[in-house]
Amino acid sequence: MTRLIIGLGNPGDRYFETKHNVGFMLLDKIAKRENVTFNHDKIFQADIATTFIDGEKIYLVKPTTFMNESGKAVHALMTYYGLDATDILVAYDDLDMAVGKIRFRQKGSAGGHNGIKSIVKHIGTQEFDRIKIGIGRPKGKMSVVNHVLSGFDIEDRIEIDLALDKLDKAVNVYLEEDDFDTVMRKFNG
């Protein structure tokens, strides 16, 4: 079986460690553990690394289309490999969750997240698995855009690193388990 694990973010050094890029950060952690490297694919408009986890071929995908067009890369890869929405897992930031909180979710609306909106638009369904990673709301009068495109302060970075460590393990459990409810019970928090 072939699966896509997609991390959402924005390409380039300017966005490397920003809150909006926690999906990319998770994939970087998985790639490091799996000892694989990302290569840019111009056709699919994504950085892609390939590995095998629990006997499944896994493509780690970081769309390079910028967040608002992430669905283009996801749709192109799904079409090429003959995959459907049940074959993808998408990791992304969530403003409405406290920093470092994680939640596996099977389906649902985009909740205002432009990357998820783009995926739903391009693949034609909301029925795909997700990992939401809490980045918290802006403090003070900071705009949402400035918040998601800013880095983490020291305390928040510690929480994010702990969440990414937990998710690194959780993704393996997700790939091994046949029961999504079990994964949600073990790791949502």
UniProtKB/Swiss-Prot annotation:
GO terms for cellular component: cytoplasm. Signal peptide: none annotated. It is found in: Cytoplasm. Its EC number is 3.1.1.29. SUPFAM superfamilies: Peptidyl-tRNA hydrolase-like. The record marks 93 as: Stabilizes the basic form of H active site to accept a proton. Pfam families: Pept_tRNA_hydro. It comes from the Bacteria. The record marks 10 as: Discriminates between blocked and unblocked aminoacyl-tRNA. Keywords: Cytoplasm, Hydrolase, RNA-binding, tRNA-binding. GO terms for molecular function: peptidyl-tRNA hydrolase activity; tRNA binding. CDD domains: PTH. One of its GO terms (biological process) is protein quality control for misfolded or incompletely synthesized proteins. TRNA binds at residues 15, 66, 68, 114. It catalyses: an N-acyl-L-alpha-aminoacyl-tRNA + H2O = an N-acyl-L-amino acid + a tRNA + H(+). The active site is at 20 (proton acceptor). InterPro entries: Pept_tRNA_hydro, Pept_tRNA_hydro_CS, Pept_tRNA_hydro_sf. Disulfide bonds: none annotated. HAMAP family: Pept_tRNA_hydro_bact. Hydrolyzes ribosome-free peptidyl-tRNAs (with 1 or more amino acids incorporated), which drop off the ribosome during protein synthesis, or as a result of ribosome stalling. Belongs to the PTH family. Monomer. This is Peptidyl-tRNA hydrolase.
